[in-house]
UniProtKB/Swiss-Prot annotation:
Residues 2-196 are annotated as: Large ATPase domain (RuvB-L). Keywords: ATP-binding, Cytoplasm, DNA damage, DNA recombination, DNA repair, DNA-binding, Hydrolase, Nucleotide-binding. This is Holliday junction branch migration complex subunit RuvB. One of its GO terms (biological process) is DNA recombination. DNA binds at residues 325, 330. Mg(2+) binds at residue 81. Belongs to the RuvB family. The lineage of its organism: Bacteria, Bacillati, Actinomycetota, Actinomycetes, Acidothermales. Has 3 domains, the large (RuvB-L) and small ATPase (RuvB-S) domains and the C-terminal head (RuvB-H) domain. The head domain binds DNA, while the ATPase domains jointly bind ATP, ADP or are empty depending on the state of the subunit in the translocation cycle. During a single DNA translocation step the structure of each domain remains the same, but their relative positions change. Residues 197-267 are annotated as: Small ATPAse domain (RuvB-S). The gene is ruvB. HAMAP family: DNA_HJ_migration_RuvB (MF_00016).
Length: 367
């Protein structure tokens, strides 16, 4: 599921980046909402998480009580928001949606919590970006369904406890490691969403094509799925752009050839890599000899913020086997060199393999 800063002169639009960035653009929210499944049995992929959620929801319905608080983690675009909506629908209860950046003070959180009705679902996106005072208030709310409101200042201040209606919090995060331990521990169920397999993405593309009344062949759906970086949101976005190409420059039917031609226009290659991805690999290989290089150095080399490189480009590059992380920084793999059409030197291959083995044997997070 990123806003560009305003400048005096509009920047050039990177069409490929708009397609591949899994953070939804505001003008696409309505279309994406229309394509979302409404029930758990309509949700494609993430079978393990679906089975676990089904058990939790069935148990809660049998007891007539709200389910435990739920934490959903994983890269953007994998269905965290959709699953939160589905949980509320399966429980036949309202859902209130907010986000961590919108909760900057304890009072902001108190205002939201005190408006919840019994059994309501509160979806808190980007929960890792919530302000610390609000986090501390949330501990008590999650555990005892109560908030303590401080009235007054100084020695004369008093604390007024406010009882809350029992509710279910669903938190979503792309950065689980940034959540304090006490907050993580208060979630009764934690699920990590993984990148999707091509077969599941093909099913998603076919379903979305039916909803959009788009004619598509099996190999056309497979081609779009193959370039979708394991992410349903990107698959749906690519489908809509390929549909435009099919209607304007072809006969309206999305075939493999039409999908390939359309995605070439948007500079999305056969692996789903776009201009930023290739810039990261190019910097690592051509400028730094394959690494190791720190995140900040890579970001400067490609002209992006470190957060953009880390959250948008790197997750899929790691998964696709183009990058590895070592205690000394990022390194390009042999696959990255070959993807750029360059034969990797033996010393680079040896260093990358050694770094990989060190990280694997250590069993510790790398830098």
């Amino acid at each position: 599921m990123t806003d560009e800063p305003l400048t005096d002169r509009p920047p050039a639009v990177d069409l490929g980046r708009l397609l591949i960035d899994a953070h939804a653009e505001s003008d696409e929210h309505a279309v994406e909402a229309a394509l979302r499944p409404r029930r758990l049995d309509e949700f494609v992929g993430q079978q393990r998480v679906r089975d676990q959620l089904s058990l939790i929801l069935d148990g809660a319905k049998q007891r007539g009580r709200p389910p435990d608080h739920i934490l959903l983690s994983g890269p953007p675009g994998l269905g965290k928001t959709t699953l939160a909506m589905i949980v509320a629908a399966e429980l036949n209860t309202p859902i209130r949606v907010t986000s961590g950046p919108a909760i900057q003070h304890a009072g902001d959180l108190a205002a939201v919590l005190t408006q919840l009705s019994e059994g309501e679902v509160l979806f808190l996106d980007e929960i890792h970006r919530m302000a610390r005072p609000a986090e501390e208030m949330l501990y008590l709310a999650m555990e005892d369904f109560r908030v303590d409101v401080v009235v007054g200042k100084g020695p004369g201040a008093s604390v007024i406890p406010l009882e809350l209606a029992p509710f279910t919090l669903i938190g979503a995060t792309t950065r689980t490691g940034l959540l304090p331990g006490p907050l993580r521990d208060r979630f009764g169920f934690t699920a990590r969403l993984d990148f999707y397999e091509p077969a599941d993405l093909e099913r998603i593309v076919h379903r979305s094509a039916r909803l959009l009344d788009v004619r598509i062949t099996p190999d056309g759906a497979a081609e779009i799925a193959r370039r979708s970086r394991g992410t349903p949101r990107i698959a749906n976005r690519l489908l809509r752009r390929v549909r435009d190409y099919a209607e304007v420059r072809a006969d309206g039917v999305i075939t493999c050839e039409v999908a390939q031609a359309a995605l070439a226009v948007y500079e999305v290659d056969e692996h789903g890599l776009d201009r930023l991805d290739r810039a990261v690999l190019d910097a690592l290989v051509r400028r730094f000899g394959g690494g190791p290089v720190g995140l900040g150095t890579v970001a400067v080399a490609v002209g992006e913020e470190p957060e953009t490189v880390e959250e948008v480009a790197e997750p899929f590059l790691f998964r696709a086997g183009f990058l590895i992380r070592t205690p000394r920084g990022r390194m390009a793999t042999a696959a990255a060199w070959r993807h750029l059409g360059i034969t990797p030197p033996p010393e680079a291959l040896g260093a990358a393999q050694l770094a990989f083995e060190i990280d694997r044997d250590a069993g510790e997070p790398t830098a």
